[in-house]
Amino acid sequence: MLNQRKSVEQLNEAEAAEELAFLAAELARHDMLYHGKDAPEISDADYDALKRRNDLIEERFPVLVREDSPSRKVGAAPSLTFAPVVHARPMLSLDNTFSDEDARAFVAGVYRFLGKLPDGSIAFTAEPKIDGLSMSLRYENRRLVTAATRGDGTTGENVTANVRTIGMIPQTLPADAPDVVEIRGEIYMAKSDFAALNAEMAAQGRPLYVNPRNTASGSLRQLDAKVTANRKLRFFAYAWGEMSAMPADTQLGMVETFKAWGFPVNPLMQRFFSADELLEHYHHIERERPDLDYDIDGVVYKVDRLDLQARLGFRSRSPRWATAHKFPAEQAFTRLKGIDIQVGRTGALTPVARLEPITVGGVVVTNATLHNEDYIRGVGNTGEPIRDGRDVRIGDMVIVQRAGDVIPQIVDVVMDERPEGAEPYRFPTTCPICGSHAVRDINEKTGKVDAVRRCTGGFVCRAQAVEHLKHFVSRNAFDIEGLGSKQIEFFFESEDENLRIRTAPEIFTLERRQEASLNKLENTDGFGKVSVRKLYEAINARRSIALHRLIYALGIRHVGETTAKLLARSYGSYEHFGAAMTEAAGFSGDAWNELNSIDGIGEVVARAIVEFYKEPRNLKVVSELLQEVTPESAELPVATDSPVAGKTVVFTGSLEKMTREEAKAKAESLGAKVAGSVSKKTDIVVAGPGAGSKLDKARELGVQTMDEDEWLALIGG
């Protein structure tokens, strides 16, 4: 999707809101797939690009930052297979850096935040970033009592029984260890053990595992601990959670203590005093990477002194005192055998490359993303040439890049290897599923042609209808257990009118239709009395549904989970929401203005919602659905006692009692949004000595202004 979008600098506020809504939904979905299901659909590099774009947009438009922003979340909610464990201290993720310049900026940022400290006075540790499964091990009175996965950072899964089978994890600690100790680290599978496991699977004629990380994660989540014991999982310790006493005052000292207690620690961890030294070690580890017996995807830098870590503190989802410097993507050469066109829920035609199998970074790759029609032609998202304008043709020798677990991308073509007679690829102008016209819309505001070609068939198109149903029952929508992709496809394809499900309301009429049918579902292959009863129970359990889940489940373009929650909070009930959307059909009037005034809903998103409600077929489906389900009223946001909660604050001029970064962090911790510029949406401007144009603009707009002492008095110091 990123290739289809403007640069951040080109976005206006409405477009930025639309982008943030899309990114919030995408990142939440990929977090669940990666952390909750161990079934990622995109590479780490693509995920990082989505995350980075979200952060850049929020940085440019701070007034659009919401409480449920992806920049304030970690991971995904734990599954229901294992008992939940609430972490005593959250397991936060790390910010990423992608270049030497970014790494230098991280070091400079630490010095800037901490104030006047001489260069070379702050020590940093550097260690490999293990590509495994994050784990928290809790010891009470020196005995292992709980092992929990990261989960969503706040709540993980209890996998204690399985972790006890990992021989290198101590069951008890020495007598000098504190009463309460939480050791955090990474569980992984060695490359050699992974290769041996796959050799065993091949000898038995069974499907091979994809990569060590997913295999390690799946092995740890076995219901039978004996299976975990046979998988030869390993562990590196590198951090901690709750500690009743601190055995050291530096990062390196803590890790050395872990080693003394019997935990494996990474031998490549070292301490340095400059960005140059950190980068030298980074490139050394990068060169050693192919020879290591474990997968790594970067190097983690941390401020060594724990008192400085405490001063630097945390952002909403990551510490300021650490960053992960990611490695560049891995590449390989292979032949392009063909191009398949997939049709998604919104009708988007997405090209996927079929490749001669090739191993990239230890994983066999057979498919790669080609993004869109223009990407195949060698044209970028703003019309600029990519790959020096070289197009991609079937039969080409291509360079495939992989930086994560699943679909890689084609980044270039080897022109000297192009077969004689290879023809330019002709992107289809009709849907390969239903035969309807496939068109590229023109953006009414910019006049530019959309990069995505879409099927115009709507619900007539089987692919769109099936994907709509899959979306409707997905985890963040109605979350109906027992209705997965295969079951949806089965019901959709059925020719029996008492079994067939073609629209969402038919899910809720299935049981009634079955009562009148001689062809019982329980007699169908893959079903039985128990499974059918559980399916009906799961369906009936969703007859009462949270308003935001209902709105999200409708599959309105540009309306992700975050936007659905915004709408639910703003309108409170479906009656109010539905009536307002119908009233806004003319794209004018009070209802239209009210929709556009919601913080986080821009005109593009608003127009998509209203267009959905103008379509008679959609209204018919929604009406039938509301005869079967009852939307719950939305909960109001929890109030806070902070006098600046929800307000937009701008700091300008010099601050004398704290650094600018510390002031920003304090304001955000109290629920305020900190902006870099003054606008009519600004609530408070805190002006220090040397304040200039921002203070003038605040006075011009009538924005409340105060000095640093008044600000500190307002927030209570």
Swiss-Prot record:
Zn(2+) binds at C431, C434, C455, C461. It is an enzyme of class 6 (ligase). Keywords: DNA damage, DNA repair, DNA replication, Ligase, Magnesium, Manganese, Metal-binding, NAD, Zinc. GO terms for cellular component: cytosol. Transmembrane segments: none annotated. Pfam families: BRCT, DNA_ligase_aden, DNA_ligase_OB, HHH_2. Its cofactor is Mg(2+); Mn(2+). GO terms for biological process: DNA repair; DNA replication. One of its GO terms (molecular function) is metal ion binding. Gene3D superfamilies: 5' to 3' exonuclease, C-terminal subdomain, 6.20.10.30, BRCT domain, DNA ligase/mRNA capping enzyme, Helix hairpin bin, Nucleic acid-binding proteins. NAD(+) binds at D44, A45, D46, Y47, D48, S93, L94, E127, R150, E186, K302, K326. Residues 639-717 form the BRCT domain. Its EC number is 6.5.1.2. The active site is at K129. SMART domains: BRCT, HhH1, LIGANc. It catalyses: NAD(+) + (deoxyribonucleotide)n-3'-hydroxyl + 5'-phospho-(deoxyribonucleotide)m = (deoxyribonucleotide)n+m + AMP + beta-nicotinamide D-nucleotide. DNA ligase that catalyzes the formation of phosphodiester linkages between 5'-phosphoryl and 3'-hydroxyl groups in double-stranded DNA using NAD as a coenzyme and as the energy source for the reaction. It is essential for DNA replication and repair of damaged DNA. Belongs to the NAD-dependent DNA ligase family. LigA subfamily. PANTHER family: CHROMOSOME TRANSMISSION FIDELITY FACTOR 18, DNA LIGASE. This is DNA ligase. It comes from Rhizobium meliloti (strain 1021) (Ensifer meliloti). The lineage of its organism: Bacteria, Pseudomonadati, Pseudomonadota, Alphaproteobacteria, Hyphomicrobiales. The gene is ligA.
